[in-house]
């Protein structure tokens, strides 16, 4: 290289060093020589390389923000494996996060580990997800999200989906599951705005895809729920005749009927799942609604398992679908109802004779009000300072129904229950098929 050429090379190298101070002199020199000492070409290539690196860094930082619970090295490795495709990386990381939660859950549950020793973790997770989809028709991402959030308890995830969506017209779109902490068009670390290949672009694409598939996420909503609807009447008749169904919270069954758009068969299918799963007979579910789903107190003996027959038409349910029948007599007494009182705060007198209903009501109210008084004594020297309505226990719901045998169209059970409440100075308000008892007046 001549003296003049050397001076020219050094001059161009000096310009590059001023423009790219983060790159070492030796690397800049290599770039310049590789491009035949063409300064403009070298600058253009270095700018593109720097821009690509900044874009990758920005996308990685956003992935770090989206999955703060995952190690950065895991995210970076997955990003490289997916050839720096943000969309593919998000999908894989969601699955990775689910698997990690499953492993954590199994680590805390030795029995669960033993049950799954012969089964691949991924297969086990997919089985759970498929079961949730079968009973809810939820999109896969919703099923996956609820499974992880509910400790990989399939039945609990199904129940929570029903409670969250029974009155909604559609499932939330896939894009909602990407918990991005900043809006797509904001400036990210390093002060750069994202390129068309960045995360915002991917999320926009995901939103467009969700809009295209929106019709498939819509849930059928032709059924208008009321206590007098033919479907509700039919379900009540099935419940009244069967102790297994009585073990399931009636309010939850109503929500199931709404979730399944009035399809009684599907309500019976989910009821079958609850009764078949032994652990759910003894488990108390306390979600935001605050009621108990199932309780062994309502089923004095271990319930047998059964399978649900396939029925093609809903209106055949009453004639062809029968759950295992323990007896069609009135309940065995007040004990199961009383034992479960402070879990459900509900008395259901379907199938009770008027005298049995009043006798059970008397025992329940004595226990209910005694607990309120005891709590008042523990919390204050003046128990009367709290007034006449309950402060420490929940109001009591007493379901009487409309009644097959009635006087002037009013249930005999209802008439006697109301008479008892009035005579004993209870504070209540009434609806067409139940009473809500809120306290007790001084005599």
Swiss-Prot record:
Per the record, the domain of life is Eukaryota
Q: Where do the Smr domain residues begin and end?
A: 347-443
GO annotation, cellular component aspect: cytosolic ribosome
* PANTHER family linked to this entry: NEDD4-BINDING PROTEIN 2
Q: Which InterPro entries match?
A: CUE, CUE2_CUE1, CUE2_CUE2, Endo/PolyKinase_Domain-Protein, Smr_dom, Smr_dom_sf, UBA-like_sf
Keyword annotations for this protein, in alphabetical order, are:
Repeat, Ubl conjugation pathway
Notes concerning its domains: The CUE domains specifically bind RPS7/eS7 polyubiquitinated by MOT2/NOT4 and HEL2.
**Protein purpose:** mRNA endonuclease involved in the No-Go Decay (NGD) pathway, which catalyzes mRNA cleavage and degradation in response to ribosome collisions. Acts downstream of the ribosome collision sensor HEL2. Specifically recognizes and binds RPS7/eS7 polyubiquitinated by MOT2/NOT4 and HEL2, promoting CUE2 recruitment to stalled ribosomes, where it mediates mRNA cleavage upstream of the colliding ribosome.
SUPFAM superfamilies on file: SMR domain-like, UBA-like
Write down the species: Saccharomyces cerevisiae (strain ATCC 204508 / S288c) (Baker's yeast)
Which residue range or ranges hold the CUE domain?
A: 8-51, 55-98
This protein is called Endonuclease CUE2
User: What biological-process GO terms show up in the record?
Assistant: nuclear-transcribed mRNA catabolic process, no-go decay; rescue of stalled ribosome
GO MF terms listed in the record are: endonuclease activity; K63-linked polyubiquitin modification-dependent protein binding; polyubiquitin modification-dependent protein binding; RNA endonuclease activity; ubiquitin binding
Repeat recorded as keyword? yes
């Amino acid at each position: 290289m001549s003296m003049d050429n050397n001076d020219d090379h050094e001059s161009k190298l000096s310009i590059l060093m001023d423009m790219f101070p983060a790159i070492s002199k030796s690397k800049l020199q290599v770039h310049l020589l590789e491009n035949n000492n063409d300064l403009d070409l070298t600058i253009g290539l270095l700018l593109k390389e720097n821009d690509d690196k900044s874009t990758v860094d920005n996308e990685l930082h956003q992935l770090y923000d989206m999955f703060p619970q995952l190690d950065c090295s895991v995210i970076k490795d997955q990003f490289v494996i997916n050839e720096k495709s943000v969309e593919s990386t998000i999908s894989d990381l969601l699955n990775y996060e689910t698997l990690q939660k499953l492993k954590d859950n199994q680590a805390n549950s030795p029995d669960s580990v033993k049950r799954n020793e012969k089964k691949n973790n991924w297969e086990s997770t997919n089985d759970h997800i498929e079961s949730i989809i079968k009973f809810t028709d939820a999109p896969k991402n919703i099923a996956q999200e609820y499974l992880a959030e509910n400790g990989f308890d399939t039945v609990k995830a199904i129940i929570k989906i029903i409670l969250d969506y029974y009155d909604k017209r559609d499932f939330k779109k896939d894009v909602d599951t990407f918990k991005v902490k900043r809006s797509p068009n904001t400036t990210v670390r390093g002060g750069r705005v994202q390129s068309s290949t960045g995360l915002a672009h991917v999320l926009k694409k995901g939103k467009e895809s969700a809009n295209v598939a929106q019709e498939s996420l819509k849930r059928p909503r032709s059924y208008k729920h009321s206590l007098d609807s033919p479907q509700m009447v039919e379900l009540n008749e099935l419940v009244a005749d069967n102790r297994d169904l009585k073990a399931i919270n009636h309010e939850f069954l109503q929500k199931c009927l709404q979730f399944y758009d009035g399809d009684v068969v599907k309500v019976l299918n989910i009821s079958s799942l609850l009764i078949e799963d032994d652990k759910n007979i003894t488990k108390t579910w306390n979600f935001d609604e605050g009621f108990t789903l199932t309780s062994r107190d309502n089923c004095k003996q271990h319930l047998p398992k059964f399978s649900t027959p396939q029925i093609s038409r809903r209106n055949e349910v009453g004639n062809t679908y029968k759950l295992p029948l323990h007896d069609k007599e009135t309940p065995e007494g007040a004990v199961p109802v009383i034992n479960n009182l402070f879990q459900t705060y509900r008395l259901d007198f379907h199938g009770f004779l008027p005298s049995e209903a009043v006798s059970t009501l008397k025992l329940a109210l004595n226990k209910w009000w005694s607990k309120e008084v005891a709590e008042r004594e523990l919390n204050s020297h003046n128990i009367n300072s709290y007034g006449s309505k309950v402060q420490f226990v929940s109001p009591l719901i007493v379901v009487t129904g409309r009644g097959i045998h009635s006087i002037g169209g009013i249930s005999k059970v209802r008439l006697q229950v109301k008479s008892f409440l009035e005579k004993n100075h209870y504070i209540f308000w009434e609806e067409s098929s139940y009473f809500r008892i809120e306290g007790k007046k001084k005599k």
